[in-house]
Each structure stands twice: as structure tokens, then as C-alpha cells.
Amino acid sequence: NPEPLPENLTEISSVDKENACDFGIVVDPDVDRLALICENGEMFGEEYTLVAVADYVLSNQKGNTVSNMSSTRALRDVTEGYGCSYASAAVGEVNVVEKMKATNAIIGGEVNGGVIYPELHYGRDALVGVALFLTHLAKKGMAVSELRKTYPNYVISKNKISLTPEIDVDNVLKTMFYI
């Protein structure tokens, strides 16, 4: 299966670990999503790809960030740690791009490993993500698993919720994002 999801990457994770590789890089067939594998064979975490890349970008240039609502607070925490603003957008690349333009964000993306870096173009681009991640890793001079430990550790459960007309969706979202 070409989807860069943990359940589809068990073989490369094993190869990465067995061969003492420094890390593994996996992209999907149209190269708009990126997954990283730590030297120990564990997944870096597709959401944390954007977090790490944003950390690097924000360390060099202050600015806003955007990710979709299917995210943990990790990007928000890293962004606010630099004294910058984070915004969330509806799921979908077009929604993230619209919010990035509206907030003048310098980095954003979807938590499926889709990095959007408007300095180059407004589209998810795994190769841009690879370049930014590798630069960040080289400057930090640490193993991929050690870099991952520097970010807030959140767990997200992506469950479908049935909505009825009586439910105030705006209030639910406001409550979720400002707890």
C-alpha cells in the first residue's frame, strides 16, 4: 500500500533498525506527504513532521502557522513558544492554504505529513519537507528520536462524531480548541 501510514511501513521500519540507518524517509506516490522513521525503527509521527519543520522555519523567521483541525496542540505550542500565532483550518489542503493566506502564515500543512511552505509555493510538498527537516536535523546535531523527544507529546483520537441540527458546532469547536 503506497499510503505512508505506520501500518504500511512495518517493513521499512524493520530494515531501518536492522541496518543501523540514521533514519528513513517515505513519501506517497504523488510526493505530497512525508513520513519519517527514527533510527530505532519507530515512527517519528506524521503530525510531528510538520511540527519539526515549523520549529526550524520559526527559529529562522518569526511568523504565523496553520494546520488542519485534525491536529493535536503540538504545532500551536511550538508556534506560541516563538511568540507567534497559530490558526487552525478545516481539513483539506485548499482550506489550509486559504487560512495560511488569510493569516500570512510562513509555514503550515496537514498532519498527514503534508508540508506547505509558501516561500516556494502553496501546495503540499514532501521534498520541501525533507529539505527543511534534514537542515533542521543537521543544525541540531541529534538523532531523529532525540529530536522527536523535544516536542510536546500529545495523543489524538480521530473518531467520527454524528452531528444533529441541535448541536452548535461552532461552540463545540471553540470548546475543543480553547480548553
Place the predicted regions along the sequence by residue.
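Phosphate-binding chemistry for phosphorylated carbohydrates and sugar-nucleotides
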Residues: 1-140, 153, 177
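Catalytic-core signal marking the mid-to-C-terminal active-site face
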Residues: 141-179
